[in-house]
Amino acid sequence: MAGRDQLTTLLNQRGVKVSTGTVGSIMNELGVRARRMRAWKNTTVSDPSARTEHIKNHMLDSHGKRDFTATVPGTRLVGDITYLKTGSGWLYLATVIDLATRMVVGWSMDSNMRTPLVINALAMARDHGRLHPEGAIFHSDRGSQYTSEQFQAWCAGNKITQYMGLTGVCWDNAVAENFFSHLKTEMYHHYDFKNHLSARTAVMEYIEGWYNRRRPHSNNQGLSPANALTAYQQQYGLAAA
């Protein structure tokens, strides 16, 4: 269930002028409560033998502080992996999020979390025209999939510069982790998935039917990621991808 701020934004966008206080009062009267995000849990498995000396550490601003923002879509991206329990075993989900719009521009799901999982997520972003033609920055944790020679070679071949945070430090990949928290509190924890297919379908519907297209995002002044992208394209006279 969405919180009162999200519901207020959605109602206002649909012409229903109402305050967050009023929405909160109505929710209390009806006994409706938003689902709270669960505590962050590290799922990274690093590879101490991986050669990462040429991969840059963090995405920092001119003051040396973490900077997970972007003004141009397709230039700065973040990615991570989470796991979803189903009746037929674990299903692993890798995502790629655009920092300019917070849109999930690529994702991949599989019964294992080997390197092709994360390559396929970035390949989806590339194939859908979501990577800037002059190159992009991709930030992740130090999971073995992201430090593998196969992934590093793929990034180099697609004009992607890798950045990485520290192992086990949640703030270093907070944007990606935040999306997973929303996915699980707003959708996943409401269902008991019998198999991979049912979970795959639900995840796809959540991402494209709700999160990207309709869910208000505070980073976009209340616009959904898709609407934020459209606003950028209209502002600069760009054709929709």
Model-based region annotation:
Residues 61-105, 111:
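An active-site-proximal beta-strand-loop segment
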Residues 1-71, 169, 224-234:
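Basic, flexible linker segments flanking DNA-binding modules
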Residues 85, 89, 107-131:
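Active-site beta-loop-alpha junctions of metal-dependent nucleic acid enzymes
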Residues 7, 23, 59, 80, ...:
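Mobile genetic element proteins and their domesticated derivatives, centered on retroelements
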Residues 156-160, 182-241:
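C-terminal domain-tail junction helix/linker
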Residues 44-46, 140-142, 148-151, 164-184, ...:
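RNase H-like two-metal-ion nuclease catalytic core shared by retroviral integrases
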Residues 101-107, 162-165, 189-190:
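Short small-residue beta-strand/loop micro-motif enriched in glycine and branched aliphatics
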